[in-house]
Every structure is written in C-alpha cells, then in structure tokens.
C-alpha cells in the first residue's frame, strides 16, 4: 500500500490492529530505520536481542486472535518476511539442515524432489526438468560446497521456523474454538528468488546473521532452481518457476476433511478476494473514502474448483511484472520475457516445464493471446518499461 504516507498504512485502510514492517525486506534480527517495525500507527525502536521477525509476527497474530473475544468474523493477514533475503535464521534451526545439503548437494536433491513430487501426484511422472543453468555439484570446490550448503541450510531454517509458527497459530485457533470455522489460505507470492542471479549467492557467507543487514546475503541461483523443481526460471520472471506456487486451503467446518486432496484447476491471486467474499457472504463495495469509485472485482471464487464443479475458472489469466509478460488460455501460455524480443508459446499441459517453444507451429494461437494481453494491459494501465538513459 505504501510506507511513505500514513494515510496508506493498514489502520487507515480498514485494519484494526497492525504489527510488522511497512517496507519490503528487513533484518530478521534487528529491523530498524526505514525498514523498522510499526505497531498500529506507532513507529517502534529497533528491538533488543534476542529477536526474530518470524516469531514476533506470529506472536502478535496470536495476540490479535486472542483479543477477538466475540463471535464476529475476523480477517487476519499474516505476511512473514521469511524466507526472503537476507539469510537470517536461528542457529539451532540451521544445525538441523547443514549436513543434509553438504552431503547430498543440489543435483541429488533436485532429482529426489522431482521423484517425490511425482509420487505425491503434484507432477506427472514423465515431467522433465527445465534446463539446468548452473554447474554440477561435483564441479564445485570443497570450499564452495561448504559455503553454499550452509547458505541453503539457513534458508531451510527460515522455512522451518515459518512452519513451526503456523503450527502455533493453528493451536491458538483450536484453543479459542475457532479452527473449524476458519478459512485458512496459505500461499507464497512468487517462485524462489535467484537475486542477484549469482550461482553461489550474493553477499559474503560471513554476513549470514549480521543483524545490520537488510539485503545480503542470499542463497543463490542454483538453490533457487532447486527450490523451483522442476520448473523454469525464478521470481520476477513469467515462466512457471516465477509464477507457479501452491495454495493450501483449509476450512474443516465448511469443506470437511479434505486433507491431502488435490485441486488442479489453475487459479491466481485475483481469485483470493472473491473466495473470501463467498466464504463470508460479504459484498464487494462500489465506493471508498468519500465516494471514490472502486474498480470492479476481478477474479473468481475458488470454491467451484474445490468442489469439483468446474475444471476452469477463467477464460484468460494475465501476468506482468518488471516487463515480464504472460497470458494463459486453456492449455496455452504465451510469454514475453524481459530479456527476450519475441513472444513465446507453450502447451503447459503437455510441456509444464516450458522446454519447447511452439510459436512457429501455432501462429494463430499466439496472435490471439498477444492481442488479448495487449487489450488487458491497456485496460489495466500496465506501463511499458521505461528505456534506460
């Protein structure tokens, strides 16, 4: 919403309580300055050690749920900064993973993940890897292996801590007898991050857990590709490795016990609002803040797909981020990468890892998709990338 104008802060946009950062990434250990903490409308000083954002964010979320004493519906948005860079984690969590990544390396782990995904039914057993963009594990020096294994262990520790704290929040819902009637939507905003696109990671490994750091170090392009197994590319890009993330949905009171059930109908971020509106029976407003007109609701509720009443929620789905463009229609997906001059076309049902560009074989499909993307971009004020000076 924006951190530089207080009128855009959460309490001025409809929330009753807020704790967290108004910026993007921050130090997990000592958020401060322009990337510091805010409680409601009050900027907070840098916290004293020991402090860890994932624990603190969850603890405040639990406090806010505990404060909700009546039976009115509540909406809680818990946005962890983990596992975004910088690499900050608790040492006891890091030690759980260090030996695993050093012993096996990224080639073996990538293959094991692909096999496990196929066994679980997440991907077809014949799904091929996207092209590997890094060195093989055996080509690294022993020192490089030590350093990158440690980076990945820190990243895994960040994810582990998120998992632990979600468990704490679920325990809180159960304690307050709210679990069965609470719709939980858990998702990531994008695929794994390769920034700054260096194979072994950005920043020095000695900077891990430096409280003063809000940016480096990172875990690197190679581990990001492992995290995105078996898909192509990373965060910011419009290939599946950038945009395809799982959504875990739970609502025992309304949906029953669907633990482990898969829904394979594609959806995307605009579907979250309609899903919540259907769940709560709320009405999407037409105006806000003194009569300012709100743009019409886009997206579709996910419930028809969850209940297996449809195998398609959208005629088209659209993406644009940092001049990376994509559109999906039926089995087809057209992409124009920021680094590419031409649109590409993939059959993402037969070729989920986008290995075979079939634009030349299906020009009529590509023309249709590009034309529709341009219409959508114009209607939604998507700006072209400004040329560098």
Language model: regions and residue ranges:
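Short, solvent-exposed turn/loop segments enriched in Gly/Ser/Thr/Pro and often Arg
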Residues: 1-6, 21-25, 76-88, 129-137, ...
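Formylglycine-dependent
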Residues: 2-104, 108, 112, 118, ...
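Histidine-centered active-site microenvironments of extracellular/periplasmic hydrolases
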Residues: 5-14, 88-89, 171-251, 257-258
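C-terminal cap/loop subdomain of S1 sulfatases and analogous C-terminal strand-loop tails that border
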Residues: 8-11, 16-17, 21-26, 213-242, ...
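Flexible glycine/proline-enriched surface loops and loop-helix/loop-strand junctions
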Residues: 40-47, 95-100, 146-152, 211-215, ...
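A long, amphipathic alpha-helix that forms part
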Residues: 58-66, 98-124, 144-182, 192-194, ...
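Beta-strand elements within well-structured catalytic alpha/beta cores of enzymes
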Residues: 61, 74-80, 159-162, 166-169, ...
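A short aromatic-rich beta-strand->coil structural motif
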Residues: 61, 75-78, 247-249, 276, ...
């Amino acid at each position: 919403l924006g951190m530089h104008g207080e009128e855009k802060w959460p309490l001025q946009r409809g929330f009753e309580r807020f704790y967290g950062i108004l910026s993007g990434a921050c130090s997990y250990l000592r958020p401060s300055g322009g990337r510091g903490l805010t409680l409601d409308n009050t900027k907070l000083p840098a916290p004293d050690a020991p402090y860890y954002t994932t624990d603190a964010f969850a603890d405040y979320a639990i406090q806010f749920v505990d404060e909700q004493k009546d039976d009115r519906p509540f909406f809680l948005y818990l946005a962890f900064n983990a596992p975004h860079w910088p690499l900050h984690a608790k040492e006891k969590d890091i030690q759980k993973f260090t030996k695993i990544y050093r012993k096996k390396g990224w080639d073996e782990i990538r293959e094991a993940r692909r096999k496990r995904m196929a066994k679980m039914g997440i991907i077809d057993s014949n799904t091929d890897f996207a092209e590997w963009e890094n060195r093989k594990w055996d080509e690294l020096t022993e020192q490089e292996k030590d350093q990158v294994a440690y980076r990945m262990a820190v990243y895994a520790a960040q994810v582990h801590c998120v998992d632990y704290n979600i468990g704490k929040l679920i325990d809180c819902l159960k304690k307050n007898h709210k679990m069965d009637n609470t719709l939980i939507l858990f998702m990531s905003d994008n695929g794994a991050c390769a920034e700054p696109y260096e194979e072994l990671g950005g920043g020095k490994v000695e900077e891990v857990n430096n409280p003063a750091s809000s940016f480096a170090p990172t875990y690197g392009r190679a581990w990001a590709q492992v995290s995105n197994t078996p898909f192509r590319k990373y965060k910011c890009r419009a290939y599946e490795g950038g945009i395809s993330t799982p959504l875990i949905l739970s609502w025992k009171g309304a949906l029953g016990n669907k633990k482990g059930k898969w829904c394979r109908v594609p959806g995307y971020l605009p579907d979250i609002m309609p899903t919540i509106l259907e769940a709560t029976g709320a009405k999407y407003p037409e105006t806000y803040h003194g009569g300012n007109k709100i743009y019409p609701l886009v997206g579709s509720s996910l419930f028809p797909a969850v209940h297996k009443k449809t195998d398609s929620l959208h005629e088209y789905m659209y993406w644009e981020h940092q001049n990376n463009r994509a559109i999906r229609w039926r089995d087809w997906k057209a992409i124009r990468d920021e680094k590419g001059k031409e649109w590409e076309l993939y059959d993402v049902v037969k070729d989920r890892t986008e290995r075979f560009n079939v634009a030349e074989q299906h020009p009529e499909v590509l023309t249709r998709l590009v034309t529709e993307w341009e219409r959508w971009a114009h209607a939604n004020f998507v700006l072209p990338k400004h040329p560098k000076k």
